[in-house]
Amino acid sequence: MKTAPVGFDAPQSSDESVDAFIDTLWLEEGLSRNTLEAYRRDLNQLRAHRQGASLFLCGEADLLAYFSAQHATTKATTANRRLTVFKRFFRWALREGRIHADPTLKLQAAKQALRVPKSLSEAQVEALLAAPDVSTALGVRDRTMLELMYASGLRVSELVDLKTLNLGLNDNVLRVLGKGAKERLVPFGEVASQWLRQYLSGARAELLGGKQTDDLFVTTKGMHAGSAMSRVMFWMVVKKYALAAGIRSALSPHTLRHAFATHLLNHGADLRAVQLLLGHADISTTTIYTHVARERLAQLHAAHHPRG
């Protein structure tokens, strides 16, 4: 006997439908665990708003009511991200025959102001990089991570996920698995290469304490000692050394990635080249950094032009 589509007599719970959708994304697109969990959270929040009712019974009016309820406390960027997740979910449900129509079809993204990434000056970056105590193994690890991120522009998740096999020290290149499981080759400079060699020649083994792993950057914290650094751990590293360097401006885990892109553009790098280095699928994402670079050029003009 043919089974009726879910959402009409709902033989499958909404929890299971979210799981099935997440499994499909993982199998077909190889999205990262962090991305998949973010999708799950957004869908579960919609379920909570609907008091646990099946998402397959959700109509356009229900979605409009959800976004209206969220409007006062949610940024446009967050609302648009959630709408993107919902559109993907309902397109999947339609494709699988679970619903007859896509309730997101007529919904449009909210207008949002251009958010320019916060960046550090070159002097601030130098102070940040010099902050770790490199007479210790932990300090060498931290200095190496900071140097490599500034030299390569990696995402934090890409940095902490690096394996020793991803390193090409002979030609100073990293093999990185980025968003959507897309692999790219990322060059880095001689200074970062020297710190990597110093870290690998002694500090890493000291931190591992006899353990074996192919994770490049390892932690010494409690029960996780000898395992890979997490994004949260690296964020704590950045905040710790920013404080030591006297940096009081607002920071984010990607501060050095933003500085990498901005400083390249300030020194005349081609926008397309920066796009490839950052691993952006769309150049419009990279274009945001040109606004930071223009601000810097305007400051230089005002400071040095005789009629500035």
At which residue positions do the language-model features occur?
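Conserved catalytic core of the tyrosine transesterase superfamily
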Residues: 1-308
